Amino acid sequence: MKHKLSAILMAFMLTTPAAFAAPEATNGTEATTGTTGTTTTTTGATTTATTTGGVAAGAVGTATVVGVATAVGVATLAVVAANDSGDGGSHNTSTTTSTTR
């Protein structure tokens, strides 16, 4: 069972950055909306603005992506662990992921 969970965790860690790349870019774009002054955005990851609103929104956007990735990883491992009897057979698992922006 320990090896199964390690393999699942490794697979999740390798696929997560690609899965969440688009929302991060979107959040970076949203961070510049509604701000006044000069705003510079680099690939949706870092936002620098002359107004505090732009900086705060950029930080929230980046933190949200990390938080969702962490929550999904923990939930996935919990579901797999709960359904694994350790006998080496296959088990039906169901994972529902909801992301709110």
Swiss-Prot record:
Keywords: Cell inner membrane, Cell membrane, Membrane, Signal, Transmembrane, Transmembrane helix. It is found in: Cell inner membrane. One of its GO terms (cellular component) is plasma membrane. It comes from the Bacteria. The keyword Cell membrane applies. The chain crosses the membrane at residues 60-80. Residues 81-101 are periplasmic. Residues 22-59 are cytoplasmic. Residues 1-21 form the signal peptide. It is a single-pass membrane protein. Residues 24-45, 82-101 are annotated as: Disordered. This is Threonine-rich inner membrane protein GfcA.
